[in-house]
A protein has these predicted regions:
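Alpha-helical transmembrane segments and their helix-entry boundary regions
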Residues: 58, 122-123, 131, 200, ...
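Central hydrophobic cores of alpha-helical transmembrane segments in multi-pass inner-membrane proteins
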Residues: 100-110
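Alpha-helical transmembrane segments in multi-pass integral membrane proteins
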Residues: 40-57, 64-92, 109-121, 179-189, ...
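Short, intrinsically disordered terminal tails adjacent to the first/last structured region
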Residues: 1-48, 413-418
Length: 418
């Protein structure tokens, strides 16, 4: 009965968010006053009045990682159109694993001590309100860019409008596309063809469900054993190249290897993030934000490592060794003045919108490159790249302020009991 209630809540929130999307004025009239009230707290763009204060540096690092994902996908375009490997910023896909670890840390910090007064329904409602409005926006943006592109699959096949609308509806309710299905409209096997990166949120949802039902109940010792077992599984996937991709960049489609690989890829860093949160004791580090940001850039910029096991070992080194240190340092540090606080809060606020809306514009960027007689050089593409990155940041901020925050506040008032 409880499960049925939760699913009813899920579809109600999804449906209401879709309705609100077409009627943004519903909550905008109160935005100015609510923003003034929110500004008096040390919380960023949360819709919940009882949210704990954020780790500001972790918010900032999440924003840095989101921007680095865009940079990685820019270079992915040159590799895709040029028919080669990603020569620059090859390991940018590891940002997703960093996101999963941050998520485990933050969710454990935010919710572990609330279960005496919070139900499963309350937890799932909060997570849906936090994540789903932007998922819907990402699907809408992806639909618009796909139509601008001419509704053309990668092989040049034209996709009927009806299938595009079905893909939009399924994405709004977060139902993944099966490879080869008519509603898998781009034709390259993506779980969410209108907005590819939504795959990571698919596994994030699974992680949230498993956290609420099982993982949170584990003792810290049991959680460490659980994490160690997952670490062995992840190392096997990475080092043995189970996917055949030459990397651990798995999870984006719904075949057997990608589903189980994506699940392990999410669960290990998520669980390790929980361990870090439970064991956390701050250390003193000067310049923590800049140190961690620089290390992320360096780690992601390492080129592909040739050799039977070398690249997989490097991925495991990053995920198992370096990322936990970065999370610990980031959680230990603090902003030193009002300006640095605003920078970290801004980066944290735009991180999710940037991540979830950027890839539809990457599709357009790839399409633009494919129309050229030959793959343009980076210098030739630089003006377009600059416009793309700046445009995504500006649009993400506008969507955050005019859509995401008002909608989340409205949904929180409706569904969250004070």
């Amino acid at each position: 009965m409880r499960v049925a209630t939760i699913f009813t809540h899920y579809f109600e929130i999804c449906t209401l968010t879709i309705v609100i999307f077409g009627y943004l004025g519903l909550s905008l009239s109160q935005t100015k006053q609510e923003t003034k009230t929110m500004a008096q707290k040390t919380i960023t763009s949360s819709a919940f009045g009882d949210s704990k204060p954020h780790y500001e540096l972790l918010d900032g690092l999440r924003g840095v990682a989101a921007l680095l994902v865009i940079w990685y996908h820019v270079w992915e375009g040159f590799a895709f159109v040029g028919g080669g490997m990603i020569e620059n910023f090859n390991h940018g896909y590891l940002a997703v694993d960093f996101f999963f670890m941050l998520s485990g840390f933050v969710i454990s910090y935010a919710y572990d001590d609330r279960w005496g007064k919070m139900s499963l329904k309350g937890f799932f409602t909060r997570r849906l309100i936090r994540l789903h409005p932007m998922l819907i926006m990402g699907a809408v943006v992806g639909t618009i860019t796909f139509l601008i592109q001419g509704s053309t699959q990668w092989d040049g096949t034209q996709t009927p409008f009806g299938w595009v609308m079905l893909a939009l509806l399924l994405t709004m309710f977060f139902i993944p596309a099966l490879p080869g299905a008519r509603y898998e409209v781009r034709g390259n096997g993506e779980m969410f063809p209108l907005n590819g990166p939504s795959w990571s949120l698919f596994f994030e949802y699974i992680g949230n469900i498993l956290y609420a039902l099982i993982i949170r109940k584990l003792s810290t010792r049991a959680l460490k054993w659980w994490t160690a077992i997952l670490g062995v599984a992840l190392a096997y996937f990475a080092v043995m190249d189970v996917s055949g991709y030459g990397s651990i960049g798995i999870g984006w489609t719904i075949d057997t290897v990608n589903f189980w690989g994506g699940l392990v890829r999410m669960l290990f860093p998520f669980s390790l993030g929980m361990v870090l949160a439970r064991e956390f004791k701050p250390i003193k580090v000067k310049g923590a934000f800049w140190i961690c940001s620089a290390l992320l850039v360096i780690l992601f910029a390492v080129p592909y490592l040739e050799g039977e096991y070398l690249n997989g070992l490097y991925e495991i080194f990053c995920i198992m060794m370096v990322f936990p240190i970065l999370v610990w340092i980031g959680a230990s540090g603090s902003t030193t003045d009002n300006a640095s606080t605003k920078v970290c809060n801004f980066l944290g606020d735009i991180s999710y919108p940037v991540y979830i809306i950027h890839y539809p514009f990457m599709y357009l960027f790839y399409y633009w490159m494919m129309q050229k007689p030959q793959c343009p050089t980076f210098g030739e593409a630089l003006p377009v790249v600059a416009i793309l990155i700046i445009g995504v940041i500006v649009l993400a901020y506008i969507i955050l302020k005019l859509y995401d925050e008002p909608v989340r506040r409205w949904l929180a008032k409706k569904f969250i009991k004070a």
